[in-house]
């Protein structure tokens, strides 16, 4: 899958470093190409729906009020 257009300006490619799953929400740590870690709290259902797992390449999308993750 590729993203063809999106209105989020701040995008960071990276790799899922760690997932801490909870019953409702989960914490996903993404290590970027520069070595920085971006952490996102998303629903556990989204973790499963996106097929997120440690080592998976993702894009962290940072908007002023939220951080979203899109799979590649």
Regions flagged by a language model, labelled:
Residues 1-72:
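Non-catalytic connector elements of ABC transporters
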């Amino acid at each position: 899958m590729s993203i063809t257009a999106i209105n989020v300006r701040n995008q960071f490619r990276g790799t899922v470093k760690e997932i801490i799953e909870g019953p409702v929400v989960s914490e996903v740590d993404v290590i970027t190409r520069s070595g920085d870690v971006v952490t996102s709290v998303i629903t556990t259902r989204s973790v499963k729906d996106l097929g997120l797992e440690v080592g998976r390449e993702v894009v962290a999308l940072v908007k002023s009020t939220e951080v979203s993750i899109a799979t590649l």
